[in-house]
Amino acid sequence: METNEMPRLEADCSRCAGLCCVAPAFAKSSDFAVNKPAGQACKNLSDDFRCRIHEELPERGFRGCVVFDCFGAGQRITQETFGGQDWRSTPKIAGGMFAVLPVMRQLHELLWLIDEALRLDEARKLHPKLRAARDEIDAVAGRPAAELRGTDVDSYRKRVVPLLRRASELARAGAGGRRPDHSGAQLIGSRMRGADLRGASFRGALLIGADLRDADLRRADFTGADLRGADLRGADLTGALFLTTSQRRAAVTDTDHL
């Protein structure tokens, strides 16, 4: 791990062996310009494991790469699980490295969500249980590759999700407004410009292409929401809950037009 307490839960590509550019399969689509089989390096991956077209990914048809977030799983696998080795210099470990990436990513995503919940003062009474869950999941993520591969991530998720939901409820209770529940809703292309959505729940909602310009989204819960192409320009996201960097990158924001 990178600190005495917790691993870094955001991607540090400089310490990773380009795992997300090799392990998963890509299907040619609006998100990827080419087909790529699992375990085959992307043609844009350089010898030093950096992307040759990183600054031009959207323009070159690789928007899927822009919105992907491993939550720090890549560097942990490279530096901790495999002790700084990489699949190019030690080909025999390639299969093992690639196999644990989806497992580690899911574990790190859970750790990230727990850390977000631990930042909520309104959920203080849940903090002991959240810390216990965090420590247990982090210990699982620190296991050897052979053990990691067989990890039942769903069993941990089922125990953590109720805590996260309750933390969200406590945080949103004081948001004011109607606090609409759009959990799991199909809101593709919905027009919600300027709407009062304080404390709303968008957990698992499909917000692809939704117009949320100038909306009041303070303390709204975005856990697992699909924000691809959602227009968030001018929206107030102060205190938004469980909104990941990858979700922000998938949406249209004010920074896209600077």
Language-model segments: which ranges?
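Tandem repeat scaffolds
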Residues: 165, 173-258
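Hydrophobic scaffolds flanking metal-cofactor catalytic centers in soluble metalloenzymes
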Residues: 1-159, 163-174
